[in-house]
């Protein structure tokens, strides 16, 4: 019996770690933050806004700042949108 309880616990823990479990009994998945990528150092600068055109080389907080202040958000493999 203890073995079954232990295996069930480990399986549920693995699902939580993989983000495949639903929280609170709802049928929606646990939200994950959007993936931000880093711009290349010394990369091109967008006109009139000071934002790098590439999304590589910037920190997560810089990417969030660009998104909130300037309406330009980094997306993996797509550069900025907005």
From Swiss-Prot:
Reply yes or no: does the keyword Secreted apply.
no
Per the record, residues carrying Serine amide are 81
GO biological process terms on file: defense response to bacterium; defense response to fungus; killing of cells of another organism
For this protein, what is any one GO molecular function term?
chitin binding
Single GO cellular component term: cytoplasm
Keyword NAD set for record:
no
Signal peptide coordinates: 1-19
Lineage: superkingdom: Eukaryota
Cystine crosslinks: 55-73, 67-74
> Which keywords appear in this protein's UniProt record, sorted alphabetically?
Amidation, Antibiotic, Antimicrobial, Chitin-binding, Disulfide bond, Fungicide, Pyrrolidone carboxylic acid, Signal
Where the protein is mainly located, per its record?
Answer: cytoplasm
Coiled coil segments of this chain:
none
Q: Which residues carry this modification: Pyrrolidone carboxylic acid?
A: 20
User: Which locations, inside or outside the cell, does it occupy?
Assistant: Cytoplasmic granule
Tell me, what does this protein do in biology? Answer: Antibacterial and antifungal activity. Presents chitin-binding activity.
* Family to which the UniProt record says this protein belongs: Belongs to the penaeidin family.
What is the name listed in the Swiss-Prot or TrEMBL entry for this protein?
A: Penaeidin-3h
């Amino acid at each position: 019996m203890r073995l079954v309880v232990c295996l069930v616990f480990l399986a549920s823990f693995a699902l939580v770690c993989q983000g495949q479990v639903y929280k609170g009994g709802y049928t929606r998945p646990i939200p994950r933050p959007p993936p931000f990528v880093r711009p290349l150092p010394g990369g091109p600068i967008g006109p009139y806004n000071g934002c790098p055109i590439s999304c590589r080389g910037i920190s997560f907080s810089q990417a969030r700042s660009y998104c909130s202040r300037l309406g330009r958000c980094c997306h993996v493999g797509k550069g900025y949108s907005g």
